[in-house]
Amino acid sequence: MKFLVLVAFLGVAVAFPISDEDDDKIVGGYSCARSAAPYQVSLNSGYHFCGGSLISSQWVLSAAHCYKSSIQVKLGEYNLAAQDGSEQTISSSKVIRHSGYNANTLNNDIMLIKLSKAATLNSYVNTVPLPTSCVTAGTTCLISGWGNTLSSGSLYPDVLQCLNAPVLSSSQCSSAYPGRITSNMICIGYLNGGKDSCQGDSGGPVVCNGQLQGFVSWGIGCAQKGYPGVYTKVCNYVSWIKTTMSSN
């Protein structure tokens, strides 16, 4: 799940939910088109607990705070409550967290999952390219997931939800979370609130101009004014990703 905490307050978990009239999807998003995010996966342990991104036929990228030693990866998933024949379920053979992951600060919140067999790629299951450069502030990106659709209360969707949101500047990000943003994090969303990723979206993709630039990591609450979502900055990890994949 997305960490809805200010992770450096002496280890105390705090979240400040608010009401919002526009809470309908992700929070404030919409139901994705069926093949809008063929790279989106659902991480399962008897239930959906996090998202992830298929970056090769046998590797998935997600958040380290989603770690479990054994994971069932569902690909081609769209409606969690129904099957349309496009789904593939493949168990993990390896789950590799970044060695520098810090559970308190959520720095280096990244992990790789090796599938026990290669996925069959098609229009519903496909890979997303890694970034060739870091994304610039102001770029609109696509966020997707099956996380909570309410900033106050809980309403989890069956159908994959999408949200278009802008990348914020590093100064906007640091101002929202003073002293807590590292160079491995980016903020994406709306400072006025109302639209955001939420619990259950963790590890799920942020795709900008066709490249995987981030995935859901943490924040204070969901869709709260002044507190945009914080995402792992994938462009900083391309070398780590490629090295880890080639050596495993």
Swiss-Prot record:
Binding site for Ca(2+): 77, 79, 87
InterPro entries: Peptidase_S1_PA, Peptidase_S1_PA_chymotrypsin, Peptidase_S1A, Serine_Proteases_S1, Trypsin_dom, TRYPSIN_HIS, TRYPSIN_SER
Cofactor note (record): Binds 1 Ca(2+) ion per subunit.
Removed propeptide positions: 16-25
Keywords from the UniProt entry: Calcium, Digestion, Disulfide bond, Hydrolase, Metal-binding, Protease, Secreted, Serine protease, Signal, Zymogen
Active-site positions on this chain: 65 (charge relay system), 109 (charge relay system), 202 (charge relay system)
Gene Ontology cellular-component terms listed: extracellular space
Compartment(s) of residence: Secreted, Extracellular space
Annotated site residues (Required for specificity) in this chain: 196
Chief localisation class: secreted
Cofactor section: Ca(2+)
Keyword hit for Cell membrane: no
One Gene Ontology term of the molecular function aspect: metal ion binding
Pfam families reported for this sequence: Trypsin
Tissues and organs where the protein is expressed, per its UniProt entry: High levels are seen in the pancreas while lower levels are found in the liver, spleen and thymus.
All copies of domain Peptidase S1, residue ranges: 26-246
Disulfide bridge map: 32-162, 50-66, 134-235, 141-208, 173-187, 198-222
PANTHER family found in the cross-reference section: RIKEN CDNA 2210010C04 GENE, TRYPSIN-RELATED
Family designation: Belongs to the peptidase S1 family.
Protein name per Swiss-Prot or TrEMBL: Trypsin I-P38
UniProt source species: Gallus gallus
Highest classification ranks of the organism: Eukaryota, Metazoa, Chordata, Craniata, Vertebrata
